Amino acid sequence: MAAFAVEPQGPALGSEPMMLGSPTSPKPGVNAQFLPGFLMGDLPAPVTPQPRSISGPSVGVMEMRSPLLAGGSPPQPVVPAHKDKSGAPPVRSIYDDISSPGLGSTPLTSRRQPNISVMQSPLVGVTSTPGTGQSMFSPASIGQPRKTTLSPAQLDPFYTQGDSLTSEDHLDDSWVTVFGFPQASASYILLQFAQYGNILKHVMSNTGNWMHIRYQSKLQARKALSKDGRIFGESIMIGVKPCIDKSVMESSDRCALSSPSLAFTPPIKTLGTPTQPGSTPRISTMRPLATAYKASTSDYQVISDRQTPKKDESLVSKAMEYMFGW
């Protein structure tokens, strides 16, 4: 009897590993249900589960989720409204929840309102201040103070010649003042500044180290002004500033009104070549470039005085050439 009772326990113990390793176990099917719903292609809130996935543990999971969705959510939930777009980026700003009429007052919205008011209050205070907000953020207001052009005397207080100038005075921009050279090098400096434009007039100081130069155009005067601080002759540093001496400008204007024909004659020409009156045409020794074209299209034909010798083509000349080899 004891041996008969022990025999059936052997196969019972041996059958346990076969039951644990059986491929027909429903556990892999239960584990498959724990994957996220968006990976399985299921809807966010399915009404009825699929027939093949119904089992005991899966029903328990659904029963555990249902109380959370039913009882734990507020009457107008905010999060489930965007449940269908959980994988997409946000489509509204964080400030839209405050002004949207469909959403109720939540602790999140009540917590955001004082923060936004604090953030906006400094900006409102800055913009409400008269003059400060516009001058900081308006490009047009930045250039408004610069519309009033200051005279050179106001820009540089060390100018003593500009004491008689007022803000209504209009100075000629074609005049420049060159200074910083010795008296012996005045002609050399004048010759150097003649390379930057046509000098109409120059007024040199008898005792000082400056001279006033008037150019033909304002562009030439600006080119001369760009040479401020340049060293000439490796020992002379020259300064160039806009001329503010009204007496020099007025005297040149009076001379131009009295003799208009001489106003356009550059005085710099008197250094090398003599000046000619404006009515007399200038005679140039250079050969015109159109001379060769005019010669080719001339109506006249050149005829030589004597006849050019030609070869005799007669029969006698051919016979003599054949016989004697001429």
Curated annotation (Swiss-Prot):
Membrane topology, as annotated, equals: Peripheral membrane protein
PROSITE patterns associated with the record: RRM_NUP35
UniProt xrefs under InterPro entries: Nucleoporin_NUP53, Nucleotide-bd_a/b_plait_sf, RBD_domain_sf, RRM_NUP35_dom
User: What GO molecular functions are on record for this protein?
Assistant: identical protein binding; nucleic acid binding; phospholipid binding; structural constituent of nuclear pore
> Which GO cellular component terms, listed alphabetically, does the Swiss-Prot or TrEMBL entry include?
cytosol; intracellular membrane-bounded organelle; nuclear envelope; nuclear membrane; nuclear pore; nuclear pore central transport channel; nuclear pore nuclear basket; nucleoplasm
According to the UniProt entry, which residues carry Phosphothreonine? T106, T129, T265, T273, T275, T280, T308
The RRM Nup35-type domain extends over: 170-250
Might you name a Gene Ontology BP term for this protein?
A: nuclear pore organization
Subcellular localization: Nucleus, Nuclear pore complex; Nucleus membrane
Give UniProt keywords alphabetically: Membrane, mRNA transport, Nuclear pore complex, Nucleus, Phosphoprotein, Protein transport, Translocation, Transport
Relate the assembly described in the record.
Interacts with TMEM48/NDC1. Forms a complex with NUP93, NUP155, NUP205 and lamin B; the interaction with NUP93 is direct.
The free-text function statement in the UniProt record for this protein reads: Functions as a component of the nuclear pore complex (NPC). NPC components, collectively referred to as nucleoporins (NUPs), can play the role of both NPC structural components and of docking or interaction partners for transiently associated nuclear transport factors. May play a role in the association of MAD1 with the NPC.
PANTHER family for the chain: NUCLEOPORIN NUP35
Protein family according to the UniProt entry = Belongs to the Nup35 family.
Q: Any idea what this protein is called?
A: Nucleoporin NUP35
Its source organism is Homo sapiens
Gene giving rise to this polypeptide: NUP35
